[in-house]
Amino acid sequence: MKFKKFIAPLLVGVLAFAIAGCGNNTNQAGQTPKEVKIGATAGPHAQVAEAVAKEAKKQGIDLKVVEFSDYVTPDKALADGDIQLNAYQHVPFMENFNKQNGSKLVAIGKTILMPMGLYSNSVRSAADVPEGSIVAIPNDPTNGGRGLALLAKAGLITLKDGVGFKATVADITSNPKNLQIQELEAAQLPRSLDDVVVAAIPMNYVQSAGLNVEKQGFFLEPKDEPVAVMILAVREQDKDNEKRTPYGVLFSCKGSVSINIK
């Protein structure tokens, strides 16, 4: 698989906030909005949020980026009201969090493209993966299933029909190379490459760890894969609350601004 065609979408993130075109820096009640906190995982998600924060500052909006090192805490912080938005996850992950925690988080927009890929320090294709190799995948429900689905698309395993990104190890119906599937916290996956043959790694951790997509990656999710598209999330109660929430001003102005991360 050639990776050059993926370089632009991987390294250029576009996060559209409706703040361009604002005539002033006050909300509809005539008050200057207080500090708005947006949660993001370290790496490209936080970089995009920081770039947006600079643009928001021009509109009189104090957007503070709160960085997290794991996948679960940003949603907990949002559900608890400690932050007002977060930008780091795909819809299935958010929906699973809602189901597991009885929360009501909703997506209000798309942010950046973050494909998961298969990475290795020793092999360059699925065909090169040796018999009995240890293969690492994320240990959270949706991204773990996403990793298994990617292994299936690469032809390394076969899964039960229809399971998709909801797959678990129990859904593997064929494993011709007798791969040993090891589930690890997503943030640990880049470091695991010294100990495993292949790891299915989300792109934000690929970039934050400084992995080389072209040299270490050999199979990537397609650009139109729904779970590769990240979202901007808020609490359901705040979704349309432009007048009473300080961050409503972010979405109440005409136009949008695109932030490029290279």
PLM ranges: what are they?
Residues 1-35:
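Short, low-complexity disordered leader/linker segments with a strong preference
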Residues 31-43, 61-67, 134-135:
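Short, well-ordered beta-strand elements
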Residues 43, 69-71, 81-95, 112, ...:
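Beta->alpha turn/N-cap motifs
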Residues 65-76, 164-191:
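Short helix-initiation/N-cap motifs at beta->coil->alpha
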Residues 96-108, 122-123, 195, 200, ...:
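Ligand-binding "clamshell"
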Residues 108-157:
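A conserved helix-loop-strand patch within extracytoplasmic ligand-binding domains
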Residues 110-119, 207-244, 248, 262:
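Periplasmic-binding protein-like
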Residues 141-166, 248-262:
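Ligand-binding clefts/hinges and TM-proximal coupling segments of bilobed small-molecule sensing domains
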